[in-house]
Amino acid sequence: MGAMAQNPPNLRPDLAPRLVIDSPRREGQPTIGMVSLGCPKALVDSERILTRLRAEGYAISPDYAGADAVIVNTCGFLDSAKAESLEAIGEALRENGRVIVTGCLGAEPDYVTGAHPKVLAVTGPHQYEQVLDAVHGAVPPAPDPFVDLLPATGVRLTPRHFSYLKISEGCNHTCRFCIIPDMRGRLASRPERAVLREAEKLVEAGVRELLVISQDTSAYGTDWKGPEKFPILPLARELGRLGAWVRLHYVYPYPHVRELIPLMAEGLVLPYLDIPFQHAHPEVLKRMARPAAAARTLDEIAAWRRDCPEITLRSTFIVGYPGETEAEFQTLLDWLDEAQLDRVGCFQYENVAGARSNALPDHVAPEVKQERWDRFMEKAQAISEAKLAAKVGRRIEVIVDEVDEDGATCRTKADAPEIDGNLFIDEGFKGLAPGDILTVEVEEAGEYDLWGRPV
């Protein structure tokens, strides 16, 4: 039997860090495996489930053979993601036979059991108690008088030097192509004190980079009734004082985002914004039920760069949205030329069960979507290549992710794990370790990656 499935990199249009877990097992100790699919928000859910189970005396298995049962935390955002989640469930059933399904696809239990009737239980997203109940029913915890005397150490599914920090759950937007509010509910922000306490513990444990995630990071705290109009601002400021790199993901383009830029210019928060613009033509954005002000967005981008010249802008876009004409797509290409975004992801539109966009007229043919995706990525690649070439000869700070006999794989402040590029050190890397932060001189640039040497 093999190791459990690694997260497919194409499962979701966002981060998909690889699952690596290992835990020593006592003789007779009940053991659970975990396959965690999809985005970092789901990964955090997996970490919480495993932390609770380990506190109850369960061991965590890195492979199917060593597990008494396997939890599959699924993704259900796109039809292609559902298909890959079903494939992962099928693999777990073949390799282990005792499978508990949770996560976004679990919100459709009939869909799951229709494909895999032998699963032990199906629970929805962030239903931690139901998952634990299902585990208890399948693999009862072994009596251990010492477990309750030991503090529960959090299980992390990322390398030790960076960690995802989920600050809220749910979303209040009604984008026609998205069903996240249906699956995960309306915005529910975690108390600032709880977020900061978790962040402090992570930094104390050696985390050098905090990746702030949610469905809508810039809306954090707007579900509260309090004197602070935009609570993400004081939260970001306090996180920045912990001494770790702080990277903001999934920032919806509200006007108050401009107030985060001074924190980046001061060095409290990394000069990096991950903002899903989705498109640039106003009519397409209206059909998406997104803000339709692409020209004003260009003005905002110019202001961000004026106030923080080192800022890196990442965004994602959808091509082939229902009704998208060639002229509307060309507007997107022209906008990309003007915006000169540093990091770009692009996805061909897919129908999602339950999404209102499915009912829109004039769906784009698959071959046209592919052709537009190719053209978009060709332009985005050229922009990336030119921007990276301009960094040759500069000295920049990097964090080390991996070191082997061939060299060190690092990231700059402009690069998030898994979705952005890397900086490679081929010489002078002896003595480096994951989590080290050092200065390098950039010697070579490619389309998405850099090469350099320590200085």
Swiss-Prot record:
It is an enzyme of class 2 (transferase). One of its GO terms (biological process) is tRNA modification. Residues 389-455 form the TRAM domain. Transmembrane segments: none annotated. GO terms for molecular function: 4 iron, 4 sulfur cluster binding; aspartic acid methylthiotransferase activity; metal ion binding; protein methylthiotransferase activity. Its EC number is 2.8.4.4. The keyword S-adenosyl-L-methionine applies. [4Fe-4S] cluster 1 binds at residues 39, 75, 104. The keyword Ion transport does not apply. Keywords: 4Fe-4S, Cytoplasm, Iron, Iron-sulfur, Metal-binding, S-adenosyl-L-methionine, Transferase. Residues 30-140 form the MTTase N-terminal domain. Gene3D superfamilies: Methylthiotransferase, N-terminal domain, Nucleic acid-binding proteins, tm_1862 like domain. GO terms for cellular component: cytosol. Residues 157-386 form the Radical SAM core domain. It catalyses: L-aspartate(89)-[ribosomal protein uS12]-hydrogen + (sulfur carrier)-SH + AH2 + 2 S-adenosyl-L-methionine = 3-methylsulfanyl-L-aspartate(89)-[ribosomal protein uS12]-hydrogen + (sulfur carrier)-H + 5'-deoxyadenosine + L-methionine + A + S-adenosyl-L-homocysteine + 2 H(+). [4Fe-4S] cluster 2 binds at residues 171, 175, 178. Binds 2 [4Fe-4S] clusters. One cluster is coordinated with 3 cysteines and an exchangeable S-adenosyl-L-methionine. Its main location: cytoplasm. It is found in: Cytoplasm. Its cofactor is [4Fe-4S] cluster. Catalyzes the methylthiolation of an aspartic acid residue of ribosomal protein uS12. This is Ribosomal protein uS12 methylthiotransferase RimO. The gene is rimO.
